[in-house]
């Protein structure tokens, strides 16, 4: 079931850099994959994506251009999984305005392609683990008690939805110690 509160988010500092550096020669995409022991059940994979969407509103999202800058928006409609085609197919600004993530499948493989502005590698792995857990829970009635797997029924923590770099830089106090003696002097 696909349902959650539609939200807008400011891009964090790193995401803004990815948007500024994006061009036709560098797509800022990365892919994570999982290999299953049996063929992917497409209906269960789609159901799993729908189920975890509310848990990851900043990943199941698109990137829109605002008046002054880009912003992130959780998807209003379900993210549809696709059969794998081209590896890391670039995302144009038009594509990003609709979705900044692709979930692909092919035989025994599940791939997730992320536009780097929505998450980094660690966030991608957290998302992949949650998706695979939800898939196995629905397919095999599997239950795993592992605190590193974020469950679909939990809501995101406030800290997950803000720019972590802001807290790091505002709490950082550094005072340079300068040598006040001149090392050389030019004279007439």
Features from the language model and the residues they span:
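Flexible, P/S/T/G-rich "lid" or insertion loops adjacent to the active sites of thioester-utilizing
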Residues: 159-188
């Amino acid at each position: 079931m696909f349902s959650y509160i539609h939200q807008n988010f400011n891009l964090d500092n790193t995401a803004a850099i990815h948007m500024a550096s994006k061009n036709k020669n560098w797509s800022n995409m990365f892919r994570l994959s999982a290999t299953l022991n049996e063929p992917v059940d497409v209906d269960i994979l789609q159901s799993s994506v729908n189920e975890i969407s509310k848990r990851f509103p900043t990943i199941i999202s698109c990137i829109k251009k605002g008046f002054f800058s880009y912003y992130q928006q959780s998807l209003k409609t379900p993210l549809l999984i696709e059969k794998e085609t081209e590896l890391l197919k670039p995302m144009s600004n038009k594509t990003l305005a609709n979705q900044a993530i692709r979930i692909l499948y092919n035989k025994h493989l599940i791939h997730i392609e992320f536009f780097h502005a929505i998450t980094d590698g660690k966030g991608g792995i957290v998302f992949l683990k949650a998706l695979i857990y939800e898939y196995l829970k629905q397919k095999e009635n599997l239950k795993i008690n592992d605190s590193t797997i974020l469950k679909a029924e939990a809501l995101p923590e406030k800290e997950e939805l803000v720019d972590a770099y802001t807290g790091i830089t505002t709490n950082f106090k550094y005072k340079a110690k300068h040598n006040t003696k001149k090392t050389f002097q030019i004279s007439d």
